[in-house]
Amino acid sequence: MTRAIVESIKKRFHELDPCTNSNYSKFKVIHTDLTLTVSFESKTLDGTVVYDLKNLDNASEVILDTSALNIKSTKVNGKEVSFELKPVTPIYGAPLRIPINPNESEIQVEISFTTTDKCTAIQFIQGDTGPYVFSQCEAIHARSLFPCFDTPAVKSPYKFTGHSPAVVTMSGRAQPTDEPNTYHFDQPIPIPSYLVSITSGNLLKAPIGPRSDVYSEEPSLKKCQWEFEKDMENFIQIAEKIVFEYEWSRFDSLVLPSSFPYGGMEIPNMTQLTPTLISGDRTQTKVMAHELAHSWSGNLVTNSSWEHFWLNEGWTVYLERRIIGAIAAAEAKEEGRKDAEKYGEQVRHFNMINGWNELADTCETFDKRYTKLVLDLENGDPDDSFSRIPYEKGFFFLYHLETKLGGIKEFDPFIKYYFNKFKYQSLNTAQFVDTLYEFYEPKGKAEILDNIDWETWLFVSGLPEKPEFDVTLANQVYALVDKWVAYVKNGGELPGDETADFEGEQDMLFLETLTEKFKTLDVKPEIIRLFPEIYPKYGASKNGEIISRWNELLISYGKYSSQDKLVQSFASWLGTIGRMKYVRPGYLLLRKGISHEFALEVFKKYEHIYHPICRTMVKKDLS
């Protein structure tokens, strides 16, 4: 039955990545050399990329992805050749066709190019201390930075060179150089195009561990250092125990300006982080655990196309929660708790509860096509499918497998086997399932796998079956929520502030559970307007997770107007951040809770600060 299951899964997705115009399957990329020169005056990058290729199929041309690039020249084996830039397609850009001799098995292709003002991968801004540029290539924006096989199916070792009057970081290990305004980097581990990155600005660094520095502009450096130095090395050591040794030499991180559209981006050797993590309370360090976990899941072992994005993110959330649970257990052990291991698992489950709530909310509000694990992205934009689905539904699928196969002790050996088997490679969902059988069939567990509902988990939209959670750490939260529900239904004594002992994750669970419960109740706005007085700590919080949930609760049920101070304050906050996790729901909240006109008015006021990816997605949300 094993082969039948795997073969049936194979038939449900595209054999080749549908989100690339390139003919990547005809070549193996031996090595890539990328040089980029930053011009802050023209807000462009001038570049040259050199590919050493092995022709696998007697191909007579190399077809690369480009988007809004100015192609200046192309060479094959050192000789200039003509090229053809095909018409632009709305999502996938313009294919670049370069003729080659089909009889030559190994060739070198060189392209000179310049980015344009339509580049979706880079953003030039004025930083805190001077001009600044950073890139963000996931999912298919690398093609607007340089001509490439823009698919996660293709991985290559790189050498990078950056020229700039300001400090440069790229996706590799810094190499010594005496050349002025020149920075060299080596990446010996093969990486896909979406992990290629360049940042340039007045950057300084501070140590946060024996193999880790944090980079940022000077005004925020000390705050960044404090936020991460307590946990960084512990995170790495625990991850190494779960998977295997960290292979990337150093794990450095870069806290970007506020317009960075994501929580973090797992750039090899230089993880990019949003400044919204610098909350002064270390409550959001799990994002660092998440980005670290990508060093194995996503970076070493990569999804072969964006249709299988869950293989990157589901695994990463799984490893992240294992790391967070292990850290909690270690701290409990230091405090002398006899139930330290049990407590660590309770912490993992508490994070799972928050994850389930996010998954349920996404399944309720998001495009149903994109609430499956394995997607159909033919003629589709991967950015449109970006949500919590691959993260949380992917996690719960892996947790389901862990549970069915016998728990952590039975699943941990598979983790090491899987990541060892596929490191430096890209894979699809069928290969993952095949590897499960390969590992567990000799252990007599094939029947367990046969009974997994693969169809529902992989190809059906919506919420999967809810697992049983250890709610020990959530009970205190639920008790306070129940008091509010009873008060709204029956009146009586007004609940007070019983959140003083809540940890950050408990505060988040309280706010989102209350918001969810109130959907089915007739909550009077006057009650909601008492909340800022009862819970002043939420109104004063600098933590983006709290700010977003707090305002969702108040604006959803308080019947505020656009002129109310609370609404004006939230609208102003949206103009100080660029993280899409907060920005997109924030504008949808203003549209639903205040008015469409007000949401558009606020967006038009601040759209110039947002990254091109974020700007495009909010426009779609509000259209």
UniProtKB/Swiss-Prot annotation:
Report the record's Gene Ontology biological process terms. cytoplasm to vacuole targeting by the NVT pathway; peptide catabolic process; proteolysis
Query: Which positions does UniProt annotate for Zn(2+) binding?
Result: 290, 294, 313
Where is the protein found, in the record's own terms?
A: Cytoplasm; Nucleus
Q: Does the keyword Metal-binding apply?
A: yes
Look up the record and report any one GO term of the cellular component aspect.
cytosol
Organism, as annotated: Candida albicans (strain SC5314 / ATCC MYA-2876) (Yeast)
**Would you tell me the protein name for this molecule?**
Leucine aminopeptidase 2
- Cofactor: record remark: Binds 1 zinc ion per subunit.
State the Gene3D superfamilies in the record. 3.30.2010.30, Neutral Protease Domain 2, Peptidase M1, leukotriene A4 hydrolase/aminopeptidase C-terminal domain, tricorn interacting facor f3 domain
What GO molecular function annotations does the UniProt record carry, in alphabetical order?
aminopeptidase activity; epoxide hydrolase activity; metallopeptidase activity; zinc ion binding
Specify which residues bind a peptide according to the UniProt entry for this protein.
136-138, 261-266
The record's catalysed reaction(s) read: an epoxide + H2O = an ethanediol
